[in-house]
C-alpha cells in the first residue's frame, strides 16, 4: 500500500515536483478597480454649454482617468438603494418647487448613505440681480422660484460656482456660507489642440488692410425685446462698431446688436448663427480673427460671469479686449478697457500693422495663459475632485486653495 511505502508521497516536497517546478498557485480573484473608485451622481439642468463646462466635461476627464465613476442624468431618482456607495450628489441650477421637495427627500436618504450634496451654478439666479434686457430672466422671475432656489442651496452641504465676486454675492443672499470657487477650465481635446502660431501670424498679415474683429455671444446680451430702451451689454460700443465698419471687418457669431441690423443686411458686418458645441472651436478658428472683444455692462450679474471669452481667445493665441471689471481681472491691463473711447483706441493699438512685432510676441504669452486653464491639468481636474470628495474647508484641499484663499 502507498501508505506503507518507504518512499515519500509524490509531490510531497519541492524536490519531488515534476521537472523540478513548483505548482503555480492560483491567485485569489481581484475586485475590478471600479469597485474601489468613488461614485458621483450629477443632476443636470441642461445639456448645453453650461452643463458641459461645469459638469459633463469634468465628468469625462474623471471617468477617462479613472479618478472616479461619474454619472449625469436629469430624471431624479427617489429609490434610496440607488445611492449606495455614492460619494457626492451634485445638483445643477435646480430652482423649482418640485426640485426643492426632491432635495428634501434626498436629505433623508443622505442620512443612510452619507453622501455629500453639492449645488452647482454658473450664473446668478437671483431675479433682482438679473438685468431686464436678459431674455432668459423670465425663468427665475417669480417669488416661488426665488424662494425655492435659496431653500435648495441652504439645504446643500456646499455651493460651487465660477468666481470670487459671485461667491461673495451668493454668501450675501444665503444662510449657507459654504461657497467654493471652481473656475471654468477649457478641455484640450475640445479647443486646446487647435492652437497654431503660424496660422495666427499669417492671418494677421493677410488681413492687415482690414483686420477681423470677432464677438461671440447669445441674444441674452442684447435688449431684443426693447425692455431697457436699447441699453444692454453692447449699447455703449455700438457707435464705435458703426464708425469703424469700413476700417475693420466686424464678425458676430450667435447674435448681433439689433441697432446694427442695417449693417448686417448690407454685408458690412458678418453674421453667423450659433454653432453646436462640437463645431464651435474649429468654426471660430476658421474665421481667422485678429482680435476678439468682450464688452459688458457693469452690474452684479456680469461681474459674476466667468472669463470664458478671454480664456477661449488665449487658448487660440488670439488677443481678447475685455471690459475692465471683475470678470476679466486676470486679463493683462493692455487688454482691458473702460470707456468706448478707450475701446476704440486699444483696438487701433493692438491691430496697427506697425505694432506687428509686439502682436506676434504676445501670441505665445496668451497661449501660456490658456494652457494654465486646461481642464486636464492635474491641478484643475484636481479642484473638481477635491470639491467632490472632501468637506468644505478641509485641509486636504491643496488645489482649491488657489481659487479660495
List the predicted regions and their residue ranges:
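Membrane-proximal helix-turn-helix segments that form the acceptor-binding/catalytic region
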Residues: 108, 112, 139-159
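Nucleotide-sugar-dependent
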Residues: 127, 223-232, 278, 282-315, ...
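Donor nucleotide-sugar binding/catalytic pocket of nucleotide-sugar-dependent glycosyltransferases
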Residues: 157-171, 175-199, 216
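Conserved catalytic-core segment of nucleotide-activated headgroup transferases in glycan assembly
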Residues: 46-61, 184-286
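N-terminal pre-catalytic "stem/leader" segment of glycosyltransferase-like enzymes
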Residues: 2, 11-98, 132, 402-404
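A short beta-strand/loop micro-motif in the catalytic core of glycosyltransferases
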Residues: 89-90, 118, 154-164, 251, ...
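A charged, aromatic-enriched C-terminal amphipathic alpha-helix characteristic of glycosyltransferases
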Residues: 198, 352-404
Amino acid at each position: 500500500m502507498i501508505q506503507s511505502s518507504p518512499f515519500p508521497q509524490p509531490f510531497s516536497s519541492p524536490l519531488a515536483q515534476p521537472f523540478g517546478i513548483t505548482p503555480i498557485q492560483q491567485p485569489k480573484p481581484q475586485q475590478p478597480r471600479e469597485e474601489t473608485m468613488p461614485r458621483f451622481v450629477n443632476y443636470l439642468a441642461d445639456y448645453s454649454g453650461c452643463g458641459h463646462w461645469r459638469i459633463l466635461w469634468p465628468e469625462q476627464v474623471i471617468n477617462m482617468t479613472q479618478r472616479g465613476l461619474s454619472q449625469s442624468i436629469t430624471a431624479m431618482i427617489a429609490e434610496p438603494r440607488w445611492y449606495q456607495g455614492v460619494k457626492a450628489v451634485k445638483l445643477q441650477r435646480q430652482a423649482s418647487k418640485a426640485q426643492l421637495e426632491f432635495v428634501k427627500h434626498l436629505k433623508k436618504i443622505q442620512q443612510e448613505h452619507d453622501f455629500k450634496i453639492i449645488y452647482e451654478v454658473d450664473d446668478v439666479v437671483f431675479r433682482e440681480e438679473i438685468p431686464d434686457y436678459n431674455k432668459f430672466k423670465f425663468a427665475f422671475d417669480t417669488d416661488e422660484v426665488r424662494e425655492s432656489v435659496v431653500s435648495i442651496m441652504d439645504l446643500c452641504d456646499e455651493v460651487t460656482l465660477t468666481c470670487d465676486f459671485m461667491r461673495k454675492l451668493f454668501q450675501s443672499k444665503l444662510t449657507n456660507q459654504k461657497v467654493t470657487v471652481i473656475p471654468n477650465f477649457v478641455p484640450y481635446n475640445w479647443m486646446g489642440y487647435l492652437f497654431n502660431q503660424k496660422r495666427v501670424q499669417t492671418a494677421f498679415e493677410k488681413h492687415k488692410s482690414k483686420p477681423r474683429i470677432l464677438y461671440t455671444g447669445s441674444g441674452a446680451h442684447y435688449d431684443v425685446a426693447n425692455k431697457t430702451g436699447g441699453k444692454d451689454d453692447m449699447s455703449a460700443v455700438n457707435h464705435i462698431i458703426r464708425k469703424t465698419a469700413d476700417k475693420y471687418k466686424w464678425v458676430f457669431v450667435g447674435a448681433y446688436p439689433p441697432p446694427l441690423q442695417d449693417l448686417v443686411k448690407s454685408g458690412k458686418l458678418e453674421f453667423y448663427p450659433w454653432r453646436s458645441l462640437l463645431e464651435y472651436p474649429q468654426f471660430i478658428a476658421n474665421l481667422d480673427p485678429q482680435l476678439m472683444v468682450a464688452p459688458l455692462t457693469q452690474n452684479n450679474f456680469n461681474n459674476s460671469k466667468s472669463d470664458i471669452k478671454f480664456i477661449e481667445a488665449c487658448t487660440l493665441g488670439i488677443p481678447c479686449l475685455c471690459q475692465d471689471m471683475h470678470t476679466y481681472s486676470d486679463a493683462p491691463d493692455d487688454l482691458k478697457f473702460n470707456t468706448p473711447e478707450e475701446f476704440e483706441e486699444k483696438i487701433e493699438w493692438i491691430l496697427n500693422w506697425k505694432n506687428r512685432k509686439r502682436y506676434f510676441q504676445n501670441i505665445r504669452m496668451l497661449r501660456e495663459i490658456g494652457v494654465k486653464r486646461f481642464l486636464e491639468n492635474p491641478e484643475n481636474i484636481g479642484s473638481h475632485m477635491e470639491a467632490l470628495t472632501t468637506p468644505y474647508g478641509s485641509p486636504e484641499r491643496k488645489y482649491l486653495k488657489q481659487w479660495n484663499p
